[in-house]
């Protein structure tokens, strides 16, 4: 048993997971979280693992790479996935959570661990000794400056945008219908169908609506998975019809026909009183935002309880700076985790924290840090962000394209994905007790 302490900076998804993994291995953790002493532009509470974008952790099935990464994490006792499973709300084939219950549960599990000491203060310098930096996309300016000095690399800037949340009672239920795309899983989404004329009116208003201005020195680089709806719309009138307003598989039961466009609403809390507008992340000003959203059939009188907002996201050039153990190449006892590493998504961020935490604990115990094979979802993510072309490095979600190729080619997509999943879960069993 070592008497050394690991400092974990940031109690988001990655930091909470890292702290838990280190603590459960018998090592003391000092977990630093600047909230509520200092807030970020996107957070609203002092809870750990607060979800600031969607409340969905995405697909839960093993034919999807993010479903595989979740199952790997379950088997490795992820505190984030355990809390998510316990706080889930209906979402078809996806794992969505009541965001308030989820954050409270993660906070409880991590804070109450006897090996975790929570420090509510801002860290402005990179500490000496074993450290995991998991400060996320909204790293404070002081620490960001230190990290820039440490790495010698310029940061990249892009923006994630959060979708509006509305009260269910303000939805005109006579104009919407309950259905999941292609009837997969339970009917979990409220669907707002649009005619071509309704879509065109909506589109024209969206394109003309005023957005919150960005600072001149910041480049607009959006990650495709969380792109503001107005930026997507600016690419062309048809773009939304192949994105968040895609109507295929969502036939209107009243007409038996597929609408011209569909806006989907997903349950956001366990009580089913709040719904978020799927894929409608935005940084429109609040007045125009309400006017545009009320052009959606069924939302004419929508009460918006949280407007869509936009915030900066920051990540390092991991191919140049990190090993697949999440260690900094030039300092063995310094680890990075979460979106700062260029993994994109809630689950991927937590997964990086899980592996960084395990390896920080192993380092203190005098054991070799683990590199997970790229036949696993977690290993494929770590491999990608540390070995891809550094020149054009961009954030990446979990996907089967990152996995090591199968020994035998399989033509059918579902069978191929099942083979990836089977191989990954068989392999991860060798690491569940590390």
Curated annotation (Swiss-Prot):
Keyword Lyase: no
CC cofactor: FAD
Matches recorded under InterPro entries: FAD/NAD-bd_sf (IPR036188), MnmG-rel (IPR002218), MnmG-rel_CS (IPR020595), MnmG_N (IPR040131), TrmFO (IPR004417)
Binding sites annotated in the UniProt record for FAD: 10-15
Catalyzed chemical reaction(s): uridine(54) in tRNA + (6R)-5,10-methylene-5,6,7,8-tetrahydrofolate + NADH + H(+) = 5-methyluridine(54) in tRNA + (6S)-5,6,7,8-tetrahydrofolate + NAD(+); uridine(54) in tRNA + (6R)-5,10-methylene-5,6,7,8-tetrahydrofolate + NADPH + H(+) = 5-methyluridine(54) in tRNA + (6S)-5,6,7,8-tetrahydrofolate + NADP(+)
Keywords annotated in UniProt: Cytoplasm, FAD, Flavoprotein, Methyltransferase, NAD, NADP, Transferase, tRNA processing
A GO BP entry: tRNA methylation
Enzyme Commission code: 2.1.1.74
Task performed by this protein: Catalyzes the folate-dependent formation of 5-methyl-uridine at position 54 (M-5-U54) in all tRNAs.
Primary location recorded for the protein, binned into one broad class: cytoplasm
Keyword S-adenosyl-L-methionine among record annotations: no
Protein name, UniProt field: Methylenetetrahydrofolate--tRNA-(uracil-5-)-methyltransferase TrmFO
Taxonomic source organism: Bacillus cytotoxicus (strain DSM 22905 / CIP 110041 / 391-98 / NVH 391-98)
Family membership noted in the UniProt record: Belongs to the MnmG family. TrmFO subfamily.
Compartments in which it is found: Cytoplasm
GO molecular function: flavin adenine dinucleotide binding; tRNA (uracil(54)-C5)-methyltransferase activity, 5,10-methylenetetrahydrofolate-dependent
GO cellular component: cytosol
One Pfam family hit: GIDA
